[in-house]
Amino acid sequence: MEISMPPPQIYVEKTLAIIKPDIVDKEEEIQDIILRSGFTIVQRRKLRLSPEQCSNFYVEKYGKMFFPNLTAYMSSGPLVAMILARHKAISYWLELLGPNNSLVAKETHPDSLRAIYGTDDLRNALHGSNDFAAAEREIRFMFPEVIVEPIPIGQAAKDYLNLHIMPTLLEGLTELCKQKPADPLIWLADWLLKNNPNKPKLCHHPIVEEPY
């Protein structure tokens, strides 16, 4: 008897990764590990936070003994923030990082990133969002211009396609049959670009160069 299996579903998550100030010089090396681990680097920026900004970012740790040292450390130099995406991005990035305390990581998870690049409990080299809510908040903090939306999965993805993609695509294919262009693929691509219902309106602003 043949068993009909449902089609596989692809789940894509986003998480925030930070290369902390004391290992910024290892950025290229760490990005190579990230890419080889199946992540896509959706966005990346290098910036320096003020102590006040660091306090706002780590607001849930306010009042703890290490809080002043943490904000001083994180504002001591430029850091690199990245939005990472892949299947189970949040949990897999945390797994790559290893324990928060780099001294513990060196003993229990010697191949983890914090064991390799970190120094101790405070200077643990890298940051990763703990859960979906944290990832959403932290991405908005570091990338305020980014629209953080859940990526459609499973039935939600099918519903999205049927509602937002298929009507425009069918209209384009119908017009394609009427026009009968010499190069159908190029014609359809151009038509879809011109008739995209979600096409944004461009607003030109001066670009401010970051100091780092």
UniProtKB/Swiss-Prot annotation:
Subcellular location(s): the record lists: Cell projection, Cilium; Cytoplasm, Cytoskeleton, Flagellum axoneme
Tissue-wise expression: Specifically expressed in testis germinal cells.
Q: Which domain of life is it from?
A: Eukaryota
CDD domains, A to Z: DD_NDKH5-like, NDPk5
Protein keywords: Cell projection, Ciliopathy, Cilium, Cytoplasm, Cytoskeleton, Developmental protein, Differentiation, Flagellum, Hydrolase, Primary ciliary dyskinesia, Spermatogenesis
Q: What is its EC number?
A: 3.1.-.-
What GO molecular functions are on record for this protein? 3'-5' exonuclease activity; nucleoside diphosphate kinase activity
Name the segments for region: NDK. Answer: 13-145
Q: Which SUPFAM superfamilies match?
A: Nucleoside diphosphate kinase, NDK
A GO cellular component annotation in the UniProt record: cilium
Query: Which InterPro entries does the record cross-reference, listed alphabetically?
Result: Dpy-30_motif (IPR007858), NDK-like_dom (IPR034907), NDK-like_dom_sf (IPR036850), NDK_H5 (IPR012410), Nucleoside_diP_kinase (IPR001564)
Q: What is its main location?
A: other
GO biological process, any: spermatid development
Q: What is known of its domains?
A: Does not possess all residues considered to be crucial for the NDPK activity.
Function recorded in the entry? Functions as part of axonemal radial spoke complexes that play an important part in the motility of sperm and cilia. Does not seem to have nucleoside diphosphate kinase (NDPK) activity. Confers protection from cell death by BAX and alters the cellular levels of several antioxidant enzymes including GPX5. May play a role in spermiogenesis by increasing the ability of late-stage spermatids to eliminate reactive oxygen species. Exhibits a 3'-5' exonuclease activity with a preference for single-stranded DNA, suggesting roles in DNA proofreading and repair.
Q: Which family does it belong to?
A: Belongs to the NDK family.
Q: How does it assemble?
A: Component of the axonemal radial spoke complex 1 (RS1), at least composed of spoke head proteins RSPH1, RSPH3, RSPH9 and the cilia-specific component RSPH4A or sperm-specific component RSPH6A, spoke stalk proteins RSPH14, DNAJB13, DYDC1, ROPN1L and NME5, and the anchor protein IQUB. Interacts with IQUB.
Q: Which disease is it linked to?
A: Ciliary dyskinesia, primary, 48, without situs inversus: A form of primary ciliary dyskinesia, a disorder characterized by abnormalities of motile cilia. Respiratory infections leading to chronic inflammation and bronchiectasis are recurrent, due to defects in the respiratory cilia. CILD48 is an autosomal recessive form. No situs abnormalities have been observed.
List the protein's name.
Nucleoside diphosphate kinase homolog 5
Native species: Homo sapiens
- Gene assigned in the entry: NME5
